Amino acid sequence: MRNLAEKWPAAPHFATATLSKGSVSVRTRGGLNQLLVSGDLAAWSEASGLAGEGVGAGAIANGDKYMVRIARDRVLAVGGQPFPIVAGWHAAGFAVTVMDAGLHVFEIEGPDLERLIARGTALDPGQPSRSASILFAGAGVLFYRFGNTHRARLHVDRGLAPYLWEWLEQAQVL
């Protein structure tokens, strides 16, 4: 019987894999705690101590803990340390779901980041959006900048990470 798995490329070992072509580099950003928060975001902010509505596509996130805006009533809380909020429904009117294993995070950095963004999406990188949820290379991702304008993070469903990695390998801007 034919082995159909032979026609697909092997998934990279994301813990060590890096791409670097020209002035853009891509790597996996591991070790982040990710919580999907749905519901009353004002109550979430009070309980978590994270203020604001979260960054949207193209906006710059900073700090050890921050929020990424997905929709009017939904954010992804991201942090280097675990959050002191338990998963599940909270009587204050919000629900928390741990997404650490569900979302893969790529960090893309370099002066040609704008060209890569233009290649992957129709988003105008000069016009930040309230929501970080965009279609990038045909996959739904959360896109925002981190720390400065030449570094971005993409959160993608873990099952789509090998596809997005292959797309990034073949992108002519890299």
What are these regions (language model features)?
Residues 1-174:
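Basic, glycine/lysine-rich polyanion-binding surfaces/domains
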